[in-house]
Amino acid sequence: MTFNEILATLPTIEHLNEIKILENGKQIHQIPAAPGKLGSLRVYNALAEEFNGKLDRTSAQKGLQLFAEHTEDARQFPSKHPNIDLLLRVIEQDLCYHIEAH
C-alpha cells in the first residue's frame, strides 16, 4: 500500500492541534496540525492510540511501515523528513519517548 492508501485507514485527526513527543516530561519534538504535516500527525496519532502513547523501537518500526515509500526517501535524504528521522533515531539508539496528542 502507498502512504496515501495507508492514511485513509488511520484514525481521524480533526480534533487535534498537535502531537508532542516527550522525554521524561520534557518536549523534544512537535508535529503541528498544519498543512504539510497532517500525514505525520495522523501516523503519530495512530501510533499513540495503538501503543498507549509509547514511542519505542516497536512502535517506531510500525511507524516506518505506515510512512511506506517515504521511509526509503528519508533514509536516502536525511533531514528531508524529520518526523521519519525521529523514528529511525528511536530504533537506532533504542530510545523510549511518550507521544502526547492535543
How would you describe each model-predicted region?
Residues 13-15, 41, 46-47, 87:
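Intrinsically disordered, charged low-complexity linkers and terminal tails
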Residues 10, 47-54, 71, 91-94:
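Generic structural signal for hydrophobic core residues of well-folded globular domains
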Residues 3-25:
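Short, charge-rich, low-complexity alpha-helical interaction segments
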Residues 61-102:
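Short, compact, well-ordered microdomains
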Residues 5-11, 55, 73, 84:
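Contiguous interface-forming segments/domains that mediate binding rather than catalysis
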Residues 4-6, 21, 30-31, 35, ...:
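A structural boundary/capping signal
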Residues 20-58:
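Amphipathic alpha-helical interaction modules
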